[in-house]
Amino acid sequence: MDSYWRLKNLVNDLPVSTSLSRQGSIYSWTVDQFQTSLGLDCGSMNMDELVKHISSAEETQEGSQRQGSTTLPPTLSKQNVGEVWKSITEEKHTNNNGGVTNITHLQGQQTLGEITLEEFFIRAGARGGNTNGGSIHDSSSSISGNPHTSLGVQIQPKAMVSDFMNNMVPRSHDSYLHQNVNGSMSTYQPQQSIMSMPNGYSYGKQIRFSNGSLGSGNQSLQDTKRSLVPSVATIPSEAITCSPVTPFPTLNGKQKINGESSLLSPSPYISNGSTSTRGGKINSEITAEKQFVDKKLRRKIKNRESAARSRARKQAQTMEVEVELENLKKDYEELLKQHVELRKRQMEPGMISLHERPERKLRRTKSDIK
């Protein structure tokens, strides 16, 4: 219990930062305000439908600031808003002591209607781009329940601080603590994005962990498993000691906690704005191949239909010839019958008239009479 109050005091001591890029935007409205203005029930619609309604409201709302599109992961787009909020508020995490801590205890018992649209999308894991070139990750995300308090806490889905208060961490007001979900601590300057290290620059001093590993200021980016954040703030002279980093198990690129897969892919909040043409080439190749297959299939179907019509025409002609042949056979049989009957009638007695031959008369051709 003492560790919880110390964590709460540490959160309250961090500086407050308002999200200037979201002022005047519909994303700064609460869910109740959005439902009242549009007359909709957000809890019963899908995440895709909610994003579409927000986009249409931004187009029709006068004086509202356009914040760009919001991208949802495939596993999240078809889920219900109420189910997503329930999964967010009922997340559980088992700490090293074997206890179970409910995350709703740290979120101040917020309801879906009290939370802003921006904070809801952040907790759900949506990725979006605004007009300033940043991502939706730049907005405020609060654990204590205040939506305008920027804690600099990088929240992963279904994750919480593990064994945070096992070792007391000395606080310094000259630097800010960047807290990872695995329990590691590093110095962090607010509103600095995670970027690749340019040539000629190096990262600040890192923190000594309890397992003996130490990150120096000249450490390269080859070890991508460790989160390196540039910082210009001062660090206390003593090394900060924290519990060893215990990464959560992953399956197919998604973190799993307590045997359940998370809603999002790893690191959905970081958007560096880089684009790649490889995906476009692959899509164009797939499209060309699909068009070729469709054309071949249409040609095959056309040939089959033509062959079927030819067979049907030949079959009709054959049937007509067969019918005509049958008629001729019947006529021939009838003629034969008539001929036989006529012969029978001629052979019956009395039916044939016998004409007597006339008597032969001798005609004198020569005469002796003189």
Curated annotation (Swiss-Prot):
Modified sites of kind Phosphoserine: 25, 44, 69
Protein's UniProt keywords contain Transcription regulation: yes
The organism's place on the tree of life at top rank: Eukaryota
Gene3D superfamilies: 1.20.5.170
One GO BP annotation of this record: positive regulation of DNA-templated transcription
Sequence ranges assigned to domain bZIP in this UniProt record: 293-356
Stretch list, region Leucine-zipper: 328-342
Residue segments, region Basic motif: 295-314
Cellular component annotations (GO), alphabetically ordered: nucleus
Modified sites of kind Phosphothreonine: 111
UniProt KW keywords: Abscisic acid signaling pathway, Activator, DNA-binding, Nucleus, Phosphoprotein, Transcription, Transcription regulation
Family: Belongs to the bZIP family. ABI5 subfamily.
Function: Could participate in abscisic acid-regulated gene expression.
Quaternary organization: DNA-binding heterodimer.
Name of the protein described by the UniProt record: ABSCISIC ACID-INSENSITIVE 5-like protein 8
Organism: Arabidopsis thaliana (Mouse-ear cress)
